[in-house]
């Protein structure tokens, strides 16, 4: 079979060479035996170089014979053959290509055409190489067959390359649009910041006016008490001056006169010893004296963001137990009985929601996770499925950050976004900005940012708590809602 293929390859190469040789003959002049230059055609139909046929007929005045067929013509008729001239140029180019291919396609060992391909050595070989000891046990096929096979393989490679090229082209086009989109996003965020700080300034101005008014009231109150005390002290001073003059006068009187009413004078002097001299304190209230350090107004604004979150037992999965104050939740292996299967209750996903949801505004709460090895916290929208099997993702109405296997943190996006947290959080802070469409998570332990979801919220959002189903020693502890302590 291999020998037949080799013979077919040889025949194909010979046929191609013969066709090229015939073309070269047709493009040659029969007089000079070179490629035709300015080819012209005479009456008999043969073609010659214009210069060659002119020299051939140089001494003739009539009966001009053809150098090939000897047929004569009465007139010197030379018609340019431009089409043949173009073919001559093509033949020259083919001759050059043939020479180059011949030089490149010859076996360096046998100087024969490399018309075959060896699969094992992945190289072109000549006919002699193919039947030699080196390549005889190998699979050798005609070059055309190998070319076709590898052409098909390359074409198969071309499709994914074109797909990747299209992907890169689309990505590049998308990236080129992003500066404009970024500019719009930055401008939107800038306006949001300006608006928020304008509101902050307004509230601070209100607090400033309130505190300044209270300060002025306190000042007027102290001034009034100072005036009253000054008047009182003035009266006492006059009384004491009169008493001192009375005592001095008594001392200058004679015995009878001095002893007259002396008891009354001495009683007045005794009362002076117990007389209390009071001064009015000008010390301001503590809040005012410490105001530059405490930033009461700003603290008051921040406190307005803190949500008073409690757990709703009507939504709790039957394997969850809530504390009496409804601030803690833990997983138990034994399912609680006699719980009504209300529409609000989760029966597949062991989680619990808060009693209050949010449809606007900014809200902040903190969850103590301690040393638990498995948990998830976040929010879900009001319309989520609570009965059947579900995958809690943003697409299904859940925005969560979770921990599993003790050290694997992720934002439950599609696919999950791994979170590389340096310090294990003992407490997680959650900040919802409904209008801005952001839900941010913070590591309260080291005061670092964990992750922020960005979405468009259109329904009521409920704080969600999942204590984990692995009730091992460390994970048996509950999730607990804690009031933020940094505001005090």
Curated annotation (Swiss-Prot):
Its EC number is 2.3.2.27. It is an enzyme of class 2 (transferase). It catalyses: S-ubiquitinyl-[E2 ubiquitin-conjugating enzyme]-L-cysteine + [acceptor protein]-L-lysine = [E2 ubiquitin-conjugating enzyme]-L-cysteine + N(6)-ubiquitinyl-[acceptor protein]-L-lysine. Autoubiquitinated. Pathway: Protein modification; protein ubiquitination. A zinc finger (RING-type) spans 29-70. Zn(2+) binds at residues 107, 110, 129, 135. GO terms for cellular component: cytosol; mitochondrion; nucleus. Residues 268-307, 359-488 are annotated as: Interaction with CDKN1A. Keywords: Apoptosis, Coiled coil, Cytoplasm, Metal-binding, Mitochondrion, Nucleus, Transferase, Ubl conjugation, Ubl conjugation pathway, Zinc, Zinc-finger. It holds the Pfam family zf-B_box. GO terms for molecular function: transferase activity; zinc ion binding. It is found in: Cytoplasm, Cytosol; Mitochondrion; Nucleus. A zinc finger (B box-type) spans 102-143. Residues 289-484 form the B30.2/SPRY domain. Residues 181-250 form a coiled coil. SUPFAM superfamilies: B-box zinc-binding domain (SSF57845), Concanavalin A-like lectins/glucanases (SSF49899), RING/U-box (SSF57850). Belongs to the TRIM/RBCC family. E3 ubiquitin-protein ligase. May facilitate apoptosis by inhibiting APC/C-Cdh1-mediated poly-ubiquitination and subsequent proteasome-mediated degradation of the pro-apoptotic protein MOAP1. Regulates the G1/S transition of the cell cycle and DNA damage-induced G2 arrest by stabilizing CDKN1A/p21. Positively regulates CDKN1A/p21 stability by competing with DTL for CDKN1A/p21 binding, therefore disrupting DCX(DTL) E3 ubiquitin ligase complex-mediated CDKN1A/p21 ubiquitination and degradation. Interacts with MOAP1. Interacts with CDKN1A. PANTHER family: E3 UBIQUITIN-PROTEIN LIGASE TRIM (PTHR24103). This is E3 ubiquitin-protein ligase TRIM39. It comes from Mus musculus (Mouse). The gene is Trim39.
